[in-house]
Amino acid sequence: MEKTPDKTVAIPKNLSLIHIYALRSAGIVAEFLLLRIPQPSEIAQMVSLVDCSLNSQLCVVWQIERECARQNRKHKVILMADEGDLREGYWDKERMIEDAVVIETQMPHVHLEGIGVNLGCYGSILPTEKNLGDLVRIARKVEERIGRKLEVVSGGATTSFELLLQGRLPKGINHLRLGEVIMNARDLFDRHGVDLSFLDSHVPILKAEVVEVFEKPTYPVGEIDVDAFGHRQDYCDRGMRRRAILALGRQDVGYLEDLIPRSNGVSILGGSSDHLILDIQDSREEWYPGKIVDFDLNYGTLMFATNSSGISIRYLTI
Protein backbone atom coordinates (compact mmCIF):
# COMPACT_ATOMS: atom_id res chain seq x y z
CA MET A 1 0.00 0.00 0.00
CA GLU A 2 1.47 3.37 -1.03
CA LYS A 3 1.76 5.67 1.96
CA THR A 4 0.98 9.36 1.92
CA PRO A 5 0.90 11.69 4.93
CA ASP A 6 -2.37 11.30 6.78
CA LYS A 7 -3.87 14.80 6.98
CA THR A 8 -5.43 13.90 10.32
CA VAL A 9 -1.97 13.25 11.82
CA ALA A 10 -0.09 16.27 13.16
CA ILE A 11 3.30 17.13 11.70
CA PRO A 12 5.83 15.04 13.66
CA LYS A 13 8.24 16.54 16.19
CA ASN A 14 10.86 13.80 15.80
CA LEU A 15 13.43 15.02 13.24
CA SER A 16 13.60 11.63 11.52
CA LEU A 17 9.84 11.56 11.05
CA ILE A 18 9.81 15.24 10.04
CA HIS A 19 12.23 14.40 7.21
CA ILE A 20 10.12 11.46 6.05
CA TYR A 21 6.95 13.57 6.29
CA ALA A 22 8.59 16.25 4.13
CA LEU A 23 9.72 13.72 1.53
CA ARG A 24 6.30 12.13 1.27
CA SER A 25 4.63 15.56 1.12
CA ALA A 26 6.96 16.45 -1.77
CA GLY A 27 5.67 13.45 -3.70
CA ILE A 28 8.72 11.22 -3.31
CA VAL A 29 7.60 7.66 -3.98
CA ALA A 30 9.95 5.29 -2.17
CA GLU A 31 10.14 2.88 0.73
CA PHE A 32 11.20 4.64 3.92
CA LEU A 33 13.15 3.08 6.80
CA LEU A 34 13.18 4.74 10.24
CA LEU A 35 16.80 4.52 11.36
CA ARG A 36 16.23 5.14 15.07
CA ILE A 37 14.19 2.72 17.15
CA PRO A 38 10.73 4.33 17.51
CA GLN A 39 9.43 6.22 20.50
CA PRO A 40 6.26 4.59 21.87
CA SER A 41 4.61 8.02 21.85
CA GLU A 42 5.07 8.35 18.06
CA ILE A 43 3.86 4.91 16.94
CA ALA A 44 0.68 6.22 15.29
CA GLN A 45 2.59 8.78 13.21
CA MET A 46 5.32 6.30 12.39
CA VAL A 47 2.89 3.66 11.12
CA SER A 48 1.23 6.32 8.96
CA LEU A 49 4.51 7.46 7.39
CA VAL A 50 7.11 4.70 7.56
CA ASP A 51 7.33 1.37 5.74
CA CYS A 52 9.97 -0.28 7.93
CA SER A 53 11.58 0.42 11.30
CA LEU A 54 14.46 -0.84 13.42
CA ASN A 55 13.27 -2.34 16.73
CA SER A 56 14.77 -3.88 19.83
CA GLN A 57 11.91 -4.57 22.26
CA LEU A 58 8.93 -6.84 21.78
CA CYS A 59 6.55 -4.61 23.75
CA VAL A 60 7.12 -1.80 21.23
CA VAL A 61 6.56 -4.13 18.28
CA TRP A 62 3.25 -5.16 19.89
CA GLN A 63 2.29 -1.47 19.93
CA ILE A 64 3.13 -1.30 16.23
CA GLU A 65 0.98 -4.37 15.57
CA ARG A 66 -2.02 -2.86 17.36
CA GLU A 67 -1.63 0.48 15.58
CA CYS A 68 -1.28 -1.23 12.20
CA ALA A 69 -4.53 -3.08 12.88
CA ARG A 70 -6.22 0.21 13.76
CA GLN A 71 -4.97 1.92 10.58
CA ASN A 72 -5.37 -1.19 8.42
CA ARG A 73 -1.73 -1.03 7.36
CA LYS A 74 1.22 -3.39 7.15
CA HIS A 75 4.62 -2.56 8.64
CA LYS A 76 8.04 -4.21 8.36
CA VAL A 77 10.49 -4.52 11.26
CA ILE A 78 14.19 -5.26 11.51
CA LEU A 79 15.20 -6.60 14.93
CA MET A 80 18.50 -5.19 16.14
CA ALA A 81 21.25 -7.24 17.79
CA ASP A 82 23.87 -5.63 20.04
CA GLU A 83 27.30 -6.94 19.04
CA GLY A 84 29.29 -4.83 21.49
CA ASP A 85 28.71 -1.19 20.55
CA LEU A 86 26.18 -1.01 23.42
CA ARG A 87 23.63 1.19 21.73
CA GLU A 88 20.30 -0.34 20.64
CA GLY A 89 19.74 -4.06 20.25
CA TYR A 90 19.28 -7.37 22.02
CA TRP A 91 22.19 -8.44 24.21
CA ASP A 92 20.44 -11.75 24.92
CA LYS A 93 20.42 -13.35 21.47
CA GLU A 94 18.25 -16.32 22.52
CA ARG A 95 15.57 -13.88 23.63
CA MET A 96 15.94 -12.10 20.30
CA ILE A 97 15.31 -15.35 18.43
CA GLU A 98 12.26 -16.14 20.57
CA ASP A 99 10.85 -12.64 20.02
CA ALA A 100 11.39 -13.05 16.28
CA VAL A 101 9.24 -16.18 16.40
CA VAL A 102 6.50 -14.28 18.26
CA ILE A 103 6.47 -11.56 15.59
CA GLU A 104 6.37 -14.13 12.81
CA THR A 105 3.57 -16.24 14.29
CA GLN A 106 1.42 -13.84 16.30
CA MET A 107 1.48 -10.47 14.52
CA PRO A 108 -0.50 -10.50 11.25
CA HIS A 109 0.09 -6.79 10.51
CA VAL A 110 3.85 -6.79 11.21
CA HIS A 111 6.31 -8.49 8.85
CA LEU A 112 9.68 -9.61 10.19
CA GLU A 113 11.87 -8.20 7.43
CA GLY A 114 15.17 -9.19 9.00
CA ILE A 115 17.76 -8.48 11.65
CA GLY A 116 20.49 -5.87 11.89
CA VAL A 117 23.29 -4.40 13.95
CA ASN A 118 24.72 -0.99 14.80
CA LEU A 119 28.48 -0.52 15.16
CA GLY A 120 30.90 2.40 15.40
CA CYS A 121 28.60 4.80 17.25
CA TYR A 122 28.35 4.88 21.05
CA GLY A 123 30.93 2.21 21.80
CA SER A 124 33.27 3.00 18.88
CA ILE A 125 33.38 -0.70 17.94
CA LEU A 126 34.66 -1.47 14.45
CA PRO A 127 32.69 -3.79 12.19
CA THR A 128 34.71 -6.99 11.75
CA GLU A 129 34.32 -10.34 10.07
CA LYS A 130 33.74 -11.78 13.55
CA ASN A 131 30.94 -9.54 14.82
CA LEU A 132 29.19 -9.43 11.45
CA GLY A 133 29.67 -13.18 11.14
CA ASP A 134 27.91 -13.52 14.49
CA LEU A 135 25.00 -11.52 13.06
CA VAL A 136 24.73 -13.89 10.10
CA ARG A 137 24.70 -16.89 12.44
CA ILE A 138 21.85 -15.34 14.44
CA ALA A 139 19.97 -14.74 11.19
CA ARG A 140 20.33 -18.39 10.23
CA LYS A 141 18.98 -19.49 13.63
CA VAL A 142 15.98 -17.18 13.21
CA GLU A 143 15.37 -18.60 9.73
CA GLU A 144 15.46 -22.14 11.09
CA ARG A 145 12.82 -21.24 13.66
CA ILE A 146 10.44 -19.38 11.35
CA GLY A 147 10.89 -21.67 8.36
CA ARG A 148 11.79 -19.06 5.74
CA LYS A 149 14.58 -16.75 4.61
CA LEU A 150 14.86 -13.27 6.04
CA GLU A 151 14.82 -10.56 3.39
CA VAL A 152 17.37 -8.39 5.21
CA VAL A 153 20.52 -8.98 7.24
CA SER A 154 21.67 -5.40 7.83
CA GLY A 155 25.37 -5.21 8.63
CA GLY A 156 25.61 -1.64 9.87
CA ALA A 157 26.26 1.73 8.30
CA THR A 158 29.15 3.59 6.66
CA THR A 159 31.71 2.05 9.03
CA SER A 160 30.98 -1.34 7.41
CA PHE A 161 31.65 -0.03 3.90
CA GLU A 162 35.40 -0.65 4.22
CA LEU A 163 34.80 -4.40 4.63
CA LEU A 164 32.63 -4.36 1.50
CA LEU A 165 35.35 -2.63 -0.53
CA GLN A 166 37.94 -5.13 0.71
CA GLY A 167 35.77 -8.13 -0.11
CA ARG A 168 35.69 -9.10 3.58
CA LEU A 169 32.00 -8.53 4.28
CA PRO A 170 30.68 -11.90 5.54
CA LYS A 171 28.49 -13.82 3.13
CA GLY A 172 24.90 -13.37 4.21
CA ILE A 173 25.10 -9.63 4.90
CA ASN A 174 22.89 -8.18 2.17
CA HIS A 175 22.08 -4.70 3.47
CA LEU A 176 24.02 -1.65 4.68
CA ARG A 177 22.51 1.61 5.90
CA LEU A 178 24.82 3.95 3.98
CA GLY A 179 24.46 7.71 4.29
CA GLU A 180 27.62 9.63 5.12
CA VAL A 181 29.84 7.85 2.60
CA ILE A 182 27.38 8.70 -0.18
CA MET A 183 26.78 12.29 0.92
CA ASN A 184 30.31 13.22 1.88
CA ALA A 185 32.90 10.40 1.54
CA ARG A 186 35.42 11.87 3.97
CA ASP A 187 35.50 10.05 7.30
CA LEU A 188 36.62 6.60 6.14
CA PHE A 189 39.55 8.18 4.28
CA ASP A 190 40.47 10.63 7.04
CA ARG A 191 40.33 8.00 9.81
CA HIS A 192 41.38 4.77 8.10
CA GLY A 193 42.91 5.78 4.77
CA VAL A 194 40.20 4.00 2.77
CA ASP A 195 40.48 4.83 -0.94
CA LEU A 196 37.29 6.69 -1.80
CA SER A 197 38.69 8.45 -4.86
CA PHE A 198 35.75 7.16 -6.92
CA LEU A 199 33.46 9.35 -4.79
CA ASP A 200 33.34 13.15 -4.39
CA SER A 201 34.40 14.29 -0.91
CA HIS A 202 33.54 17.95 -1.56
CA VAL A 203 29.80 17.72 -2.09
CA PRO A 204 28.61 19.77 0.91
CA ILE A 205 30.28 23.17 1.25
CA LEU A 206 29.54 25.39 4.23
CA LYS A 207 29.84 29.14 3.69
CA ALA A 208 30.19 31.62 6.55
CA GLU A 209 30.67 35.39 6.66
CA VAL A 210 33.53 37.26 8.32
CA VAL A 211 32.37 39.84 10.89
CA GLU A 212 35.71 41.02 12.35
CA VAL A 213 39.40 41.06 11.36
CA PHE A 214 42.06 42.19 13.85
CA GLU A 215 45.52 41.38 15.13
CA LYS A 216 45.20 40.22 18.75
CA PRO A 217 47.12 38.25 21.40
CA THR A 218 46.85 34.46 21.13
CA TYR A 219 46.69 34.00 24.91
CA PRO A 220 43.67 35.41 26.81
CA VAL A 221 44.41 38.38 29.05
CA GLY A 222 43.07 38.28 32.62
CA GLU A 223 42.04 35.60 35.13
CA ILE A 224 41.13 32.44 33.20
CA ASP A 225 38.10 30.40 34.27
CA VAL A 226 35.84 28.16 32.16
CA ASP A 227 34.41 28.91 28.72
CA ALA A 228 30.74 29.51 27.89
CA PHE A 229 30.05 25.77 28.10
CA GLY A 230 31.73 25.23 31.45
CA HIS A 231 34.90 23.66 30.02
CA ARG A 232 38.49 24.58 30.76
CA GLN A 233 40.47 25.25 27.60
CA ASP A 234 44.17 25.11 26.81
CA TYR A 235 45.61 28.14 25.02
CA CYS A 236 48.96 28.41 23.24
CA ASP A 237 50.81 31.73 23.47
CA ARG A 238 52.09 32.51 19.96
CA GLY A 239 52.28 36.24 20.41
CA MET A 240 50.26 38.72 18.35
CA ARG A 241 48.61 37.18 15.29
CA ARG A 242 46.02 38.22 12.75
CA ARG A 243 42.65 36.53 13.14
CA ALA A 244 39.10 36.64 11.82
CA ILE A 245 35.75 36.08 13.51
CA LEU A 246 32.94 34.46 11.50
CA ALA A 247 29.19 34.44 12.14
CA LEU A 248 29.06 30.71 12.83
CA GLY A 249 29.09 28.77 16.08
CA ARG A 250 28.52 25.54 17.95
CA GLN A 251 24.77 26.00 17.64
CA ASP A 252 25.24 25.58 13.88
CA VAL A 253 27.90 22.88 13.47
CA GLY A 254 28.47 21.39 16.90
CA TYR A 255 32.20 20.69 16.62
CA LEU A 256 33.97 23.84 15.45
CA GLU A 257 37.37 22.13 15.55
CA ASP A 258 36.18 19.59 12.96
CA LEU A 259 35.48 22.19 10.28
CA ILE A 260 37.93 22.00 7.37
CA PRO A 261 38.84 25.45 5.94
CA ARG A 262 39.24 25.40 2.16
CA SER A 263 41.57 28.40 2.32
CA ASN A 264 45.30 27.73 2.69
CA GLY A 265 47.14 29.09 5.71
CA VAL A 266 44.02 29.14 7.89
CA SER A 267 43.51 27.27 11.16
CA ILE A 268 40.65 27.10 13.64
CA LEU A 269 41.31 28.59 17.07
CA GLY A 270 37.89 27.92 18.58
CA GLY A 271 34.70 29.83 19.19
CA SER A 272 31.45 29.96 21.10
CA SER A 273 27.73 29.51 20.52
CA ASP A 274 27.61 31.86 17.54
CA HIS A 275 31.22 32.86 16.82
CA LEU A 276 34.04 31.03 15.03
CA ILE A 277 37.60 32.33 15.43
CA LEU A 278 40.22 31.65 12.74
CA ASP A 279 43.97 32.23 12.72
CA ILE A 280 44.66 33.88 9.34
CA GLN A 281 48.23 35.07 9.94
CA ASP A 282 49.67 32.74 7.29
CA SER A 283 46.93 33.25 4.70
CA ARG A 284 47.75 35.15 1.52
CA GLU A 285 44.11 36.03 0.87
CA GLU A 286 42.57 39.41 1.59
CA TRP A 287 40.46 39.31 4.76
CA TYR A 288 37.74 41.82 5.61
CA PRO A 289 34.25 41.94 7.19
CA GLY A 290 31.82 40.56 4.64
CA LYS A 291 34.24 38.04 3.11
CA ILE A 292 32.67 34.60 2.57
CA VAL A 293 34.76 31.65 3.73
CA ASP A 294 34.23 28.05 2.53
CA PHE A 295 34.56 24.92 4.66
CA ASP A 296 34.44 21.20 3.98
CA LEU A 297 32.50 19.11 6.50
CA ASN A 298 32.83 15.74 8.16
CA TYR A 299 29.91 13.61 9.39
CA GLY A 300 29.46 15.46 12.68
CA THR A 301 29.53 19.00 11.33
CA LEU A 302 27.36 18.00 8.35
CA MET A 303 24.77 16.45 10.67
CA PHE A 304 24.53 19.62 12.79
CA ALA A 305 24.58 22.00 9.83
CA THR A 306 21.78 20.27 7.93
CA ASN A 307 19.57 20.40 11.01
CA SER A 308 20.37 23.99 12.04
CA SER A 309 17.61 26.56 11.59
CA GLY A 310 20.33 29.20 11.31
CA ILE A 311 21.81 27.76 8.12
CA SER A 312 20.05 28.01 4.78
CA ILE A 313 20.56 25.12 2.37
CA ARG A 314 20.91 25.50 -1.40
CA TYR A 315 20.94 22.46 -3.68
CA LEU A 316 23.01 22.85 -6.84
CA THR A 317 23.08 20.60 -9.89
CA ILE A 318 26.24 20.33 -11.95
Language-model features and meaning:
Residues M1-K130, R137, R145-I146:
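Active-site-proximal beta-alpha core segment in soluble small-molecule metabolic enzymes
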Residues I11, I18, G133-I318:
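Active-site anion/phosphate-binding pocket segments in diverse small-molecule metabolic enzymes
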